[in-house]
Amino acid sequence: MEPRAVADALETGEEDVVMEALRAYNRENSQSFTFDDAQQEDRKRLAKLLVSVLEQGLPPSRRVIWLQSIRILSRDRSCLDSFTSRRSLQALACYAGISASQGSVPEPLNMDVVLESLKCLCNLVLSSPVAQALAAEAGLVVRLAERVGLCRQSSFPHDVQFFDLRLLFLLTALRTDVRQQLFQELQGVRLLTRALELTLGMTEGERHPELLPPQETERAMEILKVLFNITFDSIKREVDEEDAALYRHLGTLLRHCVMLAAAGDRTEELHGHAVNLLGNLPVKCLDVLLTLEPHEGSLEFLGVNMDVIRVLLSFMEKRLHQTHRLKESVAPVLSVLTECARMHRPARKFLKAQVLPPLRDVRTRPEVGELLRNKLVRLMTHLDTDVKRVAAEFLFVLCSESVPRFIKYTGYGNAAGLLAARGLMAGGRPEGQYSEDEDTDTDEYKEAKASINPVTGRVEEKPPNPMEGMTEEQKEHEAMKLVNMFDKLSRHRVIQPMGMSPRGQLTSLQDAMCETMEGQLSSDPDSDPD
């Protein structure tokens, strides 16, 4: 049914005609997400008519059908202005049961009305900054948090619980003030951790499910997404003992999520959200990933249960096969594995054995091949600086932050970016709590070590001498041509001569020489100022 015909029916005011027109429109457009520009003005007119009645108050018999029509039109950005008034948003919040102005004992809720209202609010908040601001001002997060906290006692159906969480996710993703309010005033981490525990069936006395059902999977992922939003900067925050205990408890739930299978084909998606949130936890709280006791069937390494680390490594390898959005898919799991390896020697040695086994193939460049090491070395020269940084950091930590060992496995050319950023171009080792474990060399590596090109990280055939057969005069002529070419490039600032500063960082040759001379003068006791 055309929007003009529906609008005409609404203007008649005859209830039977109005409801029949709206039912037909809803039925025909329930799956419409794009709209014809030619009918834009008709849809705007229809939206205004729907909103005017919504703001005055809908009789119970009309609410579901009316809200369904509003939900469909709220997908159309050209109609948003009609729906984003303070009165219309307040009306939707009241029908959803999340208005702060409602009394402590609100009227009984019709769950179909609640669900349609929540869907309308989600559409509006997603698409309209005005709706986002009005929702924040109205304090919808307070009632949403109350409902999430009552999920065990409430008789709300799955769809309502899910869209409560979806609206909470959108508000915390799009509004900093709502994020802070949920985190600080409403104790969002504690509240949502408890909700996650209940959703996963992890409470005392309950048998832990081996396969998470579809509805619980959907709700768990929404909870993880909201937790990610409100803990986004907690990794940078100092936490006291009470908060650390809470984050460790959350970490145990995330560990369970990583080990859990989800119904259908959503296991990797669930694991992805859990890994993203693990990356937000304070580093000292990640020790819970390695506190599972070894048991029959578990992977034990140096007396430690490595099941979680193995799953995370397998998850990372799957993500490496993706060719798009590597930053979102690979960086979080690499960061988590890096911190586990940095803090825990058994985890580092296990990961090194899997990722950087003793070198045998010394004739292939480190970035060539389909081994996990090859894939990670390729990421070290990725266009995205965050991707190459986390990949290099992970391999560097697996090498116990030893520069020679890092160069051995990756080649100096691939390693140069991280070494320059760390001020380690001159070698050395940063401060770190690493044991002096030996890096066992294979016989193949020992035999070829002297012939390995440190820049490429492989044995290369000796190239022919380009000056072979030239006279001394010809050699001198070619050398001067080369000098003149470099001089021209330098004078036109196409290239800049670089040197190594005393701190091990690349800098201009002139600055490097000045710093070196200043260092020598300051360390010479016989030197006096002029």
Swiss-Prot record:
One of its GO terms (molecular function) is guanyl-nucleotide exchange factor activity. The modification Phosphothreonine is found at T440, T442. It comes from the Eukaryota. Phosphorylated at Ser-435 and Thr-440 by CK2, stabilizing its interface with G alpha proteins. Belongs to the synembryn family. Chaperone that specifically binds and folds nascent G alpha proteins prior to G protein heterotrimer formation, promoting their stability and activity: folds GNAI1, GNAO1, GNA13 and GNAQ. Does not fold G(s) G-alpha proteins GNAS nor GNAL. Also acts as a guanine nucleotide exchange factor (GEF) for G alpha proteins by stimulating exchange of bound GDP for free GTP. This is Chaperone Ric-8A. It comes from Bos taurus.
